[in-house]
């Protein structure tokens, strides 16, 4: 009989449910959801374990074997966490998918991962239905009635769509944890695909176990009450908020999504003492109209990845908080700047046990102040490892020379403090997401009024370090009526929100090289010059 191991998610929850069955570990705030009358949802360790057993039994009943994959596509609901624990119990592999994903990106993710089924929110059913015909291996759908998508909820129980709620009403089964090792995979988290198709990072149970231990890195206290509105499909919400809370017994609060206007009210309502944010979120929060009670909140610490140096100290003063800055990626690499230490704008130094360097194109370490790629490996000198699902070549390139190649460009100062500057190759990072321009170009190119399109990035108006706004350079069909508003509408229909261009740049032609490669520098020069050809959603 295998000994239980808290590095395995299923074991952790089973043990905590035995120790503290009535402890209310999860709260899902539903302020502003639906008609505003929905009560918050709470899960104790005991209820979390019971529902995870029910979902695990449902996965096994649907024929999912060890290591087989299913999609998990929903906003922040308790059922998301329960499905994660269920995957660990059943030794299946979950594939978290942003619920805004649609079209070819959604189809590619499900197809590449070989998902046999999908657990989703009812508001995702239309997106899934639009691509289901191209996914012959997708045998089943378990849908959650969210209480906010009334028309979509009516689809549950029809056309191969089963009710997750019905599963959760079953008598509680006892599912023996089928995992054999913490190194068995728990999930495949797909990258944004900035340089091609998205790649699936295979994350073992032990990786989530390491997330659970990050509470010590972030300095969480025993009475901490964390909050996040970031999607649980994203590594940040799992690493900064969920993992440490489950492990340490912190009464954590989630909301369905991040809303800057309700952030502080949610923290006041639940007594939250810390929250997490990415990229341009800091500027969005700071841009809200000032209130007399801005600093009247229970938050002591904001765990940030990408706080703009320009507003860092003003943000702390206005809201009465301290900023804990950190850096990391799902593939690996972790650094942090303790509160009150190091220069403003730095993301810190690597955690103990990890080496992090700034290197040039030849792999030589850059001197202080010189920008190079951020790379990392174990401090023991062992080679870094990463596994991209079904992509051995990409896995090899990611760890060429034994170092994890982040693709991020940065520099260090003379005291070894590290700074992020931009994404290698000029890829677009917008509101924390790396944008695959090919998806954006495809949607715009299919618009009947568009003859040519090229998508690139410009420095974000938010000022967030490394962030860019999305520009779509467009040539319209000669003689055809052209409406920028209709292009924006098509983008909203075919893309997730972060992929929708910030600007449309209308041109007579897109400058290109002899090999038909668009010349971005000329487009950028024209954009910076302004003029009548630049449109935003408001101006269109």
Regions of interest found by a model, annotated:
Residues 5, 22-77, 81-85, 102-107, ...:
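Conserved AMP-binding/adenylate-forming core of the ANL superfamily
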Residues 6, 21-24, 143, 159-162, ...:
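Conserved pre-ATP/AMP-binding loop-to-beta segment of ANL
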Residues 11, 61-62, 85, 89-166, ...:
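Structural core segment of the AMP-binding/adenylate-forming
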Residues 49-54, 182, 187, 201-222, ...:
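Conserved structural elements of the adenylate-forming
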Residues 101, 118-120, 356, 376-382, ...:
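AMP-binding/adenylate-forming catalytic core of the ANL superfamily
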Residues 144, 496-517, 536-540:
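AMP-binding/adenylate-forming catalytic domain of the ANL superfamily
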Residues 209-225, 233-273, 288:
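Conserved AMP-binding/adenylation subdomain of ANL enzymes
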Residues 247, 269-277, 286-344, 355, ...:
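Gly/Ser/Thr-rich phosphate-binding loop
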């Amino acid at each position: 009989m295998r000994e239980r191991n808290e590095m395995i998610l299923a074991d952790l929850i089973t043990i905590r449910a035995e120790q503290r069955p009535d402890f209310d570990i999860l709260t899902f705030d539903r302020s502003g959801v639906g008609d505003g009358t929905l009560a918050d949802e709470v899960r104790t360790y005991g209820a979390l374990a019971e529902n995870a057993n029910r979902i695990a039994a449902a996965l096994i009943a649907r024929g999912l074997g060890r290591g087989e994959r299913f999609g998990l596509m929903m906003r922040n609901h308790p059922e998301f966490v329960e499905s994660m624990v269920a995957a660990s119990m059943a030794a299946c592999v979950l594939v978290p998918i942003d619920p805004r994903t649609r079209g070819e990106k959604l189809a590619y993710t499900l197809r590449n991962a070989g998902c046999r089924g999908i657990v989703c929110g009812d508001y995702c059913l239309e997106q899934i239905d639009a691509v289901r015909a191209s996914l012959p291996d997708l045998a089943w759908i378990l849908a959650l009635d969210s209480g906010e998508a009334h028309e979509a909820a009516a689809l549950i129980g029809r056309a191969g769509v089963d009710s997750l709620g019905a599963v959760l009403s079953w008598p509680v089964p006892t599912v023996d944890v089928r995992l054999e090792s913490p190194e068995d995979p728990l999930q495949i988290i797909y990258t944004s695909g900035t340089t091609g198709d998205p790649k699936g990072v295979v994350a073992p149970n032990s990786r989530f176990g390491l997330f659970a231990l990050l509470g010590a890195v972030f300095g969480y206290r025993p009475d901490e009450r964390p909050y996040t509105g970031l999607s649980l499909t994203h590594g940040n919400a799992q690493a900064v908020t969920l993992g440490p809370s489950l492990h340490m017994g912190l009464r954590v609060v989630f909301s369905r999504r991040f809303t800057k206007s309700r952030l502080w009210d949610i923290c006041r309502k639940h007594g939250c003492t810390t929250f997490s944010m990415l990229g341009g979120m800091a500027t969005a929060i700071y841009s809200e109209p000032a209130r007399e009670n801005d600093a009247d909140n229970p938050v002591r610490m904001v765990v940030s990845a990408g706080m703009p140096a320009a507003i860092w100290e003003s943000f702390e003063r206005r809201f009465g908080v301290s900023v804990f800055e950190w850096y990391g990626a799902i593939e690996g690499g972790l650094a942090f700047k303790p509160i009150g230490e190091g220069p403003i704008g730095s993301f810190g130094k690597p955690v103990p046990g990890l080496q992090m360097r700034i290197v040039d194109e030849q792999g030589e370490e850059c001197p202080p102040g010189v920008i190079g790629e951020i790379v990392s490996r174990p401090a023991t000198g062992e080679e870094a490892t990463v596994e991209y699902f079904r992509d051995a070549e990409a896995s090899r390139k990611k760890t060429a020379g034994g170092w994890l190649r982040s693709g991020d460009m940065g520099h260090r100062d003379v005291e070894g403090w590290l700074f992020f500057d931009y994404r290698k190759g000029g890829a677009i990072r917008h509101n924390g997401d790396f944008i695959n321009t090919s998806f954006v170009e495809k949607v715009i190119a299919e618009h009947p009024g568009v003859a040519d399109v090229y998508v690139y990035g410009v420095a974000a108006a938010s000022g967030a370090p490394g962030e860019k706004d999305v520009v779509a350079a467009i040539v319209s069909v000669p003689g055809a009526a052209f409406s920028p508003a209709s292009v924006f509408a098509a983008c909203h229909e075919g893309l997730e929100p972060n992929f929708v261009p910030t600007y449309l740049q209308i041109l007579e032609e897109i400058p290109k090289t002899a090999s038909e490669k668009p010349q971005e520098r000329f487009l950028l020069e024209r954009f910076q010059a302004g003029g009548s050809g630049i449109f935003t959603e408001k101006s269109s």
